[in-house]
Amino acid sequence: MLSRAGKVVCIGRNYAAHIRELNNPFPTKPFFFLKPTSAIVEPGHGNLIIPPDVSAHYEVELGLIMKDRLPARRPVSSNSWLDSIGAYFVGIDMTARNIQNEAKKKGLPWSFAKGYDTFLPVGPIIPKHLIPDPHNVILELSLNGKVVQKDSTSLMLNKIPKIFSSITEAMSLNPGDLVLTGTPKGVGPVVPGDILSARLLTAQEQEIIPSKFEIKAEKCD
């Protein structure tokens, strides 16, 4: 179960068009934030809960499930990075955009904006052999049946070997840890009653099965 992961490490600003759409500066080096495992909602285990006074935005991402340990402060070889991945999944990195924007203005960390319960809906585990090249698949997210995000992972600014190398400058990646690799352009708001659907496609736009999942947003009681 993904909810039993030791940690969830996420890279920020890893697609150029997404950086531009939010008028963010381009980072000079990869940077990361953590999401709590309590944010994870697996298929069939509940809805997306939007708290009062929160402007929630969707961000679809390719997720990696670690199989092998990558110890901190040791080089990640060109051969070991792919071997260290056990499987994949599609995740929706929900963000309390108003909370994040306020934190950014004050120069404060914005993990709080990413960490609400249910703010990481995830799809089914995708066996590794179904994705020979994780840099050549298409992320797709639909809101109420309309496609709002659709782009290739080939557009990542920092590819997975660089992501792993940057994370392990500070911390080890252990078996079962999850890594989110960034979101493409097209992010936007979600309100109670909306239905989000996410999936992964091959470069030829064939759906990768299993990858698709659906989740409904509801207001917090």
From Swiss-Prot:
Coiled-coil segments: none
Subcellular location: Mitochondrion; Cytoplasm
InterPro entries, alphabetized: Fumarylacetoacetase-like_C, Fumarylacetoacetase_C_sf
Keyword Membrane: no
Enzyme Commission number: 5.3.2.2
Cofactor: Mg(2+); Mn(2+)
Entry annotated with the keyword Cytoplasm: yes
Enzyme superclass (EC): isomerase
Keywords: Cytoplasm, Hydrolase, Isomerase, Magnesium, Metal-binding, Mitochondrion
GO molecular function: acetylpyruvate hydrolase activity; acylpyruvate hydrolase activity; metal ion binding; oxaloacetate tautomerase activity
Chain sites annotated for binding Mg(2+): E59, E61, D93
Cystine bridges: none
Pfam families assigned to the protein according to its UniProt record, in alphabetical order: FAA_hydrolase (PF01557)
Annotated PANTHER family: ACYLPYRUVASE, ACYLPYRUVASE FAHD1, MITOCHONDRIAL
Name listed for the protein in its UniProt record: Oxaloacetate tautomerase oaa1, mitochondrial
Species this protein is from: Schizosaccharomyces pombe (strain 972 / ATCC 24843)
